[in-house]
């Protein structure tokens, strides 16, 4: 992905002409913002059509003020997305694959439920309902494993958030994918650890 700038131009007169950025299906263009008369875009793809010379199309670097605005906006988007993991008690998108071999809700409500079960189970076993609503007969030790994995997943989500934030803060405004990239958080799959041991 690369940063480009151009200056749209409209000529006056009875048959005025507007010169602007030419697009095609082979490239993805995201408008990043404007500074003075220039429009800054991020373009993904190499098959950029020839542009009218009147628009002064060129590879460019974002001006510092526009870069700062974009960084602030992206950090706010990241924070809002990450708060879904903390602020929403029930989050159906937040699940892990446990080392016990099944999917488990890992949101705050599920963690609280696990803590409650661990507190009252004693030496008995209990039915635990997984992410797919399948019952599993589990011991206290197995419930503790699930809780530990849910908490570890939460730590991993924060590490992913901080990595995105560091990349945004370190963006230079030249060829920074993170200025337009979608934030994707990956939930943990603890079943892989069993296979790799």
PLM regions with names:
Residues 2-3, 9-35, 44-197:
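A preference for well-ordered globular domain cores
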């Amino acid at each position: 992905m690369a940063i480009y700038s151009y200056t749209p131009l409209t000529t006056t007169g009875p048959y005025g002409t507007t010169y602007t950025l030419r697009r095609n299906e082979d490239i993805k263009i995201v408008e990043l913002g404007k500074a003075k008369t220039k429009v800054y875009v991020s373009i993904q793809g190499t098959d950029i059509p020839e542009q009218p010379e009147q628009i002064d199309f060129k590879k460019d670097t974002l001006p510092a003020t526009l870069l700062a605005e974009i960084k602030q906006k992206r950090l706010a988007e990241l924070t809002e997305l990450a708060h879904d993991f903390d602020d929403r008690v029930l989050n159906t998108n937040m699940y892990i694959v446990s080392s016990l071999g099944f999917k488990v809700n890992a949101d705050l409500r599920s963690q609280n439920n696990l803590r409650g079960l661990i507190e009252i189970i004693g030496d008995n076993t209990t039915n635990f309902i997984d992410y797919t609503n399948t019952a599993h007969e589990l011991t206290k030790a197995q419930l503790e494993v699930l809780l530990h994995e849910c908490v570890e997943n939460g730590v991993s989500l924060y590490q992913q958030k901080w990595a995105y934030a560091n990349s945004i803060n370190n963006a230079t405004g030249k060829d920074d994918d993170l200025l337009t990239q979608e934030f994707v958080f990956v939930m943990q799959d603890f079943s892989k650890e069993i296979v790799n041991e």
